[in-house]
Amino acid sequence: MAQNLSLEKDKIRFLMLEGLHDNAFKVLSEAGYHNVENIKTALDPEELIEKIKDAHFIGIRSRTHLTRDILEKAEKLIAIGCFCIGTNQVDLEAARELGIPVFNAPYSNTRSVAELVLAEIIMLMRGIPEKNAVVHRGG
């Protein structure tokens, strides 16, 4: 179970998976956290167990699945950051039982969704779907 710890910043280990934005690493570095491992992809369960066992914090997106088995082997884990909308990739009951808080970024896609809506409005106003269909039919 995660304990209340007071660790020096240079001893706190971050495991960041799935190509998180470079700003995350800049913010951590500026705050004095330099023990940050950045892996651009999700890991298979065996690799994840090996990497997470010494991590205090893990940052993930939607491809990494933190099961009860994985969380129980993460003895030093203090918190889980889901840098995505949901937390369904984390066994929340196991995290709660182990005293590991889980947080997410529920509005991380807001700007992208707004941009897409505006682009689709413009596309519909200009009749692009109809014109596209005509071109594909050879007309």
Feature names for model-found ranges:
Residues 98, 106-139:
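Phosphate-binding beta-alpha-beta segment of Rossmann-like dinucleotide-binding domains, i.e.
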Residues 1-103:
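An N-terminal-biased, well-structured beta-alpha scaffold segment characteristic
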